[in-house]
């Protein structure tokens, strides 16, 4: 007697793969949050999170790159220790780092949209260095625009003080993160994995 079974795909293979990649990059940003350095001229520490934001946008594109950072924020808000130095909870999303955190999905989407010239992923070998660097500079502007606004709101800082403490103080570190991201993209390490 033959048994007839039918299977129903609730989620396509491509969607499942993209969701898994988004979760992986959310975890990467969370791991990078543990790498912190005090910044003597800012109330906010330097972390490697922004490097993860750049990489999410570059490798996943604007849609899934942004989604990965929404997943990251949700995990942290629900108690996963993925924010700066292993902190967690919704309070982080309304505290002094709130502007930076809320900017991450937008910045990843912007970086991905510039690198891929839209929502469809393209071969990263065809992306020129000026486009790659320009996308990350634009992502940095988004992150520090949100971050400065958050510092002004939460800490009642004036615009000049907020820009000095919330953006200018981080520019050397951001240049290094951009260089690191270029190194990762231009190496064949990710493609080989």
Indicate where each model-derived feature is located:
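Interfacial aromatic-anchored transmembrane helix boundaries in multi-pass membrane proteins
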Residues: 34-45, 73-107
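Small-polar-interrupted transmembrane alpha-helices in polytopic inner-membrane proteins
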Residues: 25-29, 65-80, 147
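Short helix-perturbing small/polar motifs within transmembrane alpha-helices
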Residues: 2-8, 17-24, 31, 92, ...
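Membrane-water interface at transmembrane helix exits
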Residues: 33-37, 76, 111, 115-119, ...
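Alpha-helical transmembrane segments and their helix-entry boundary regions
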Residues: 65-69, 101, 132, 162
């Amino acid at each position: 007697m033959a048994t007839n079974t039918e299977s129903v795909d609730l989620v396509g293979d491509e969607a499942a793969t993209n969701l898994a990649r988004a979760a992986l990059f959310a975890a990467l940003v969370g791991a990078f949050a543990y790498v912190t350095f005090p910044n003597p001229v800012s109330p906010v520490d330097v972390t490697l999170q922004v490097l993860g934001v750049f990489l999410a946008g570059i490798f996943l594109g604007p849609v899934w790159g942004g989604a990965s950072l929404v997943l990251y924020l949700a995990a942290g808000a629900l108690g996963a220790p993925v924010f700066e130095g292993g902190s967690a909870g919704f309070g982080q999303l309304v505290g002094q780092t709130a502007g930076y955190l809320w900017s991450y999905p937008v910045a990843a989407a912007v970086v991905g949209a510039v690198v891929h010239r839209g929502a469809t992923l393209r071969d990263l070998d065809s992306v020129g260095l000026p486009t790659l660097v320009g996308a990350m500079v634009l992502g940095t502007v988004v992150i520090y625009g949100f971050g400065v606004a958050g510092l002004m709101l939460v800490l009642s800082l004036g615009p000049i003080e907020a820009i000095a403490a919330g953006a200018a103080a981080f520019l050397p570190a951001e240049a290094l993160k951009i260089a690191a991201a270029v190194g990762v993209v231009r190496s064949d390490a990710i493609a080989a994995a």
